[in-house]
């Protein structure tokens, strides 16, 4: 019984300390979560929308209109 109790407590600790066990303002989906602070204001160019993918720790942009690129820096022709 003591072994079971110890294993249960270890499992709870893993869940509480993992990223998946943490709560965020917005649930992550395929497009990540909205950027905050300086990234929200200046990471994307040409009116793009900044997103953050928590699982890989990367920022990217959803571009508007005729722009492409990681930060919406390229105009399509």
From Swiss-Prot:
The keyword Transferase does not apply. It holds the Pfam family EGF. It comes from the Eukaryota. Residues 1-23 form the signal peptide. Has both toxic and EGF activity. Its EGF activity consists of rounding cells (morphological change) and inducing tyrosine phosphorylation of the EGFR in A431 cells, but with a lower potency that human EGF. Belongs to the EGF domain peptide family. PROSITE patterns: EGF_1, EGF_3. This is U-actitoxin-Avd12a. Residues 31-73 form the EGF-like domain. It comes from Anemonia viridis (Snakelocks anemone). One of its GO terms (cellular component) is extracellular region. It is found in: Secreted; Nematocyst. Keywords: Disulfide bond, EGF-like domain, Nematocyst, Secreted, Signal. Disulfide bonds join 35-50, 44-61, 63-72. Residues 24-29 form a propeptide.
